[in-house]
Amino acid sequence: MATNIGMMDSAYFVGRNEILSWINDRLHLNLSRIEEAASGAVQCQMLDMTFPGVVPMHKVNFEAKNEYEMIQNYKVMQEVFTKLKITKPLEVNRLVKGRPLDNLEFLQWLKRFCDSINGGIMNENYNPVERRSRGGREKSVKGSSKISKSLQTNNMHHPPVATSNKPAGPKQAKSHGIGGGSNSSAEVQALSKEVEDLKVSVDLLEKERDFYFSKLRDIEILCQTPELDDLPIVVAVKKILYATDANESVLEEAQECLNQSLGLEGYEEEGKEEEEEEEEEEEEAAAAAETQT
């Protein structure tokens, strides 16, 4: 099994939309963001689809919201990895934080791994809805079936009510103010145009977001190259890339870390001392010139 997939493998260049389509098509879900798969439940079911019967799906919690609930799903996944002798390390602490880059990378690996097993062909005999034993969607379906059954039994016990064939009285026409129709039509057109403009704006923003996201992803892939992993500049870039909070001091910390690694702080201090000495010499020379005059 292709468990060792290098960072420069084509698998890590698969886009976010393709990953989401892969998940939604196979598991009959409706995910719109990569972060929604941070609980680990989706990954467990993908493994269950690829290796039927290996994953204890009754232990997988699709409603996990807290980190401790998500960690339980990753424990199930780790047990499956052990059974299948998969050597891929699970960075649970990063994945449960819901960071898009970390979760996208893991899902890219998972897709590449599953495709290497089944050739990218969907298992037509697999019913993902039935296999999910704890999902909220399945609960709602069960509830609706119970309601329909109760309605059927009630209809069996109660005879149908006879309907009258008498013609109904004339309905009173709703009165509209003069010009009301034209005003409402103009409002509808204005609102429709506003909606279209907003859709265009959202589309442009999504494209811009995806563009910068792909750039960040390229930088991350480059930084994770083993030959570059320990370089001071790469360590500084990772510090900024993996910062969880929008903290302005992150850049300063990264610069300080880089300066320490390169030994630039000593040079800066020496430069300051030299400048101070030069200033003192200039002041002494100026004072000596004044005394001579």
From Swiss-Prot:
InterPro entries membership: CH_dom, CH_dom_sf, EB1_C, EB1_C_sf, MAPRE
Q: Which Pfam families match?
A: CH, EB1
A molecular function (GO) held by this record is: microtubule binding
Residue spans of biased composition, Polar residues class? 151-166
Give start-end positions of Acidic residues composition bias. 266-285
Can you supply a Gene Ontology BP term from the record? positive gravitropism
Do you know which Gene3D superfamilies this protein is assigned to? 1.20.5.1430, Calponin-like domain
GO CC terms in record: cortical microtubule, transverse to long axis; microtubule; microtubule organizing center; nucleus; phragmoplast; spindle; spindle pole
Q: Where is this region: Disordered?
A: 124-188, 262-293
Q: Which UniProt keywords apply?
A: Cell cycle, Cell division, Cytoplasm, Cytoskeleton, Microtubule, Mitosis
The lineage's top-level taxon is Eukaryota
| Protein location | Cytoplasm, Cytoskeleton, Spindle pole; Cytoplasm, Cytoskeleton, Phragmoplast
Q: Where expressed (tissue)? A: Highly expressed in guard cells of leaf stomata, pollen grains and pollen tubes. Expressed in young roots.
Please report the stretch or stretches of sequence annotated as the EB1 C-terminal domain: 180-250
Biased region (Basic and acidic residues) positions are 129-141
Tell me, according to the record, the phenotype of the null mutant.
Answer: No visible phenotype under normal growth conditions, but root growth is affected in response to gravity or touch stimuli. conditions.
Q: Where is the Calponin-homology (CH) domain?
A: 13-115
Domain comment in the entry: Composed of two functionally independent domains. The N-terminal domain forms a hydrophobic cleft involved in microtubule binding and the C-terminal is involved in protein binding. In Arabidopsis thaliana, EB1A and EB1B possess an acidic C-terminal tail that has autoinhibitory function, but EB1C has a tail region with patches of basic amino acid residues required for nuclear targeting.
- What remark does the entry add? Plant microtubules behave differently from those of other eukaryotes in mitosis: they lack centrosomes and spindles are barrel-shaped with unfocused poles and no astral microtubules.
**What is the role of the protein in this entry?**
Binds to the plus end of microtubules and regulates the dynamics of the microtubule cytoskeleton. May be involved in anchoring microtubules to their nucleation sites and/or functioning as a reservoir for distribution to the growing end. In plants, microtubule minus ends are not necessarily severed from the nucleation site and transported to the plus end of a microtubule as part of the recycling process. May play a role in endomembrane organization during polarized growth of plant cells.
Would you identify the family this protein belongs to, as annotated?
Answer: Belongs to the MAPRE family.
How would you summarize the oligomeric state and partners of this protein? Homodimer and heterodimer with EB1A.
Q: What is this protein called?
A: Microtubule-associated protein RP/EB family member 1B
The lineage is:
Eukaryota, Viridiplantae, Streptophyta, Embryophyta, Tracheophyta
Encoding gene (name): EB1B
